[in-house]
């Protein structure tokens, strides 16, 4: 599902809402998550999951085309950990 599809789905479930309002709401939620992560803070949505940053050590990588070694700097990458409720709902077995 894309962001546009999410917005369309929310509007179809709530016909009283304007598309622009839903779009602004979804964008603002995502923006707030990104702002907190930029500040190095963890974001937790109970039952859904949490967003945090994981540190990646500097390492030597390899260019797949040339085979040449490439030095990769250390960096922080976003990480999502699913919450208990989400895990239970998607367990299809």
Swiss-Prot record:
GO CC annotations on file: chromosome; cytosol
GO biological process: DNA recombination; regulation of DNA-templated transcription; regulation of translation
InterPro entries, alphabetized: Hist_DNA-bd (IPR000119), Histone-like_DNA-bd_CS (IPR020816), IHF-like_DNA-bd_dom_sf (IPR010992), IHF_beta (IPR005685)
Record field: transmembrane: none
UniProt entry keywords in alphabetical sequence: DNA recombination, DNA-binding, Transcription, Transcription regulation, Translation regulation
CDD domains referenced in this protein's UniProt entry, alphabetically: IHF_B (cd13836)
Family matches, as PROSITE patterns: HISTONE_LIKE (PS00045)
Keyword Transcription regulation annotated: yes
Recorded GO MF terms: DNA binding; structural constituent of chromatin
Domain of life: Bacteria
NCBIfam families, per database record: hip (TIGR00988), PRK00199.1 (NF001222)
Family of the protein in this entry: Belongs to the bacterial histone-like protein family.
Subunit: Heterodimer of an alpha and a beta chain.
Function, as annotated: This protein is one of the two subunits of integration host factor, a specific DNA-binding protein that functions in genetic recombination as well as in transcriptional and translational control.
Family matches, as HAMAP family: IHF_beta
PANTHER family the record matches: DNA-BINDING PROTEIN HU (PTHR33175), INTEGRATION HOST FACTOR SUBUNIT BETA (PTHR33175:SF5)
Name the record gives this protein: Integration host factor subunit beta
Lineage summary: Bacteria, Pseudomonadati, Pseudomonadota, Gammaproteobacteria, Pasteurellales
């Amino acid at each position: 599902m894309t962001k546009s599809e999410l917005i369309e789905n929310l509007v179809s479930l709530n016909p009283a809402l304007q598309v622009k309002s839903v779009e602004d709401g979804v964008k603002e939620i995502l923006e707030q998550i990104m702002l907190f992560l930029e500040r190095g803070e963890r974001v937790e949505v109970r039952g859904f999951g949490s967003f945090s940053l994981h540190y990646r050590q500097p390492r030597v990588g390899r260019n797949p085309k040339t085979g040449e070694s490439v030095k990769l700097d250390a960096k922080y990458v976003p990480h999502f950990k699913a919450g208990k409720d989400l895990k239970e709902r998607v367990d299809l077995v």
